[in-house]
């Protein structure tokens, strides 16, 4: 992992944000992080017992990103998730009962048990789900952003992708198009340092 130092401006802004949020909001955010961690550990246990169909990409250790990102958005904004997205779904307001039902292949799940761990979409809550193709959600975010712009609504699309997806050409093409068209898209690269199994220093120079 590369060592780096935060600029004085970033440190100053960090302290400002902490002050703005206040102790009650910070406690609420911490509680949410604990809930996500507990949920993920339970999901991992069920997966190891063979109760979950399909594969599972956990987000243990990435809870703060999920909670922080969701608190930066507002009701009515859109979410496009990625492979390790359980925490983002929960932070966006998804029901843990319906999420777990989805993992277990039950009809009461968000996608009637057919989407499994990764494809949880809660369209009523503007959570548009994840894509089976690495970085597949990033170009879709351009379409969502264009829709927002054409409808002239005060919304934003948050699209999340990992460091592994950052190697995909579609990510850079999509960012360029969103920039040219001035679209309301927020790109969040959730860098866990290893993607699936490739250390970041070997994937990027």
Predicted regions, residues:
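A short alpha-helix capping/helix-coil boundary motif
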Residues: 8-9, 21-23, 46-48, 123, ...
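A short, structure-level motif marking secondary-structure boundaries and short turns
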Residues: 15, 28, 158-160, 194-196
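Aromatic side chains
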Residues: 39, 47, 83-86, 161, ...
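Cofactor-binding active-site loop characterized by glycine-rich and histidine/acidic residues
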Residues: 44, 51-181, 199-205
């Amino acid at each position: 992992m590369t060592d780096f130092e935060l600029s004085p401006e970033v440190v100053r802004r960090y302290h400002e944000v902490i002050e703005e949020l206040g102790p009650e909001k910070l406690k609420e955010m911490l509680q949410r992080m604990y809930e996500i961690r507990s949920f993920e550990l339970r999901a991992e246990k069920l997966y190891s017992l063979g109760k979950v169909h399909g594969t599972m990409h956990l987000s243990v250790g990435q809870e703060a990103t999920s909670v922080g990102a969701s608190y930066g958005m507002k009701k009515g904004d859109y979410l496009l998730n990625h492979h390790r997205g359980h925490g983002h779904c929960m932070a966006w307001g998804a029901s843990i009962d319906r999420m777990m039902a989805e993992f277990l292949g039950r009809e009461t799940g968000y996608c009637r048990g057919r989407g499994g761990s990764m494809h949880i979409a809660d369209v009523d809550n503007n959570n548009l789900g994840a894509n089976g193709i690495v970085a597949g959600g990033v170009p879709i975010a351009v379409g969502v952003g264009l829709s927002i712009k054409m409808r002239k609504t005060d919304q934003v699309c948050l699209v999340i992708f990992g460091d592994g997806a950052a190697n995909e050409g579609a990510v850079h093409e999509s960012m360029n198009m969103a920039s040219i068209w001035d679209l309301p898209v927020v790109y969040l690269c959730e860098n866990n340092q290893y993607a699936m199994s490739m250390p970041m220093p070997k994937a990027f120079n």
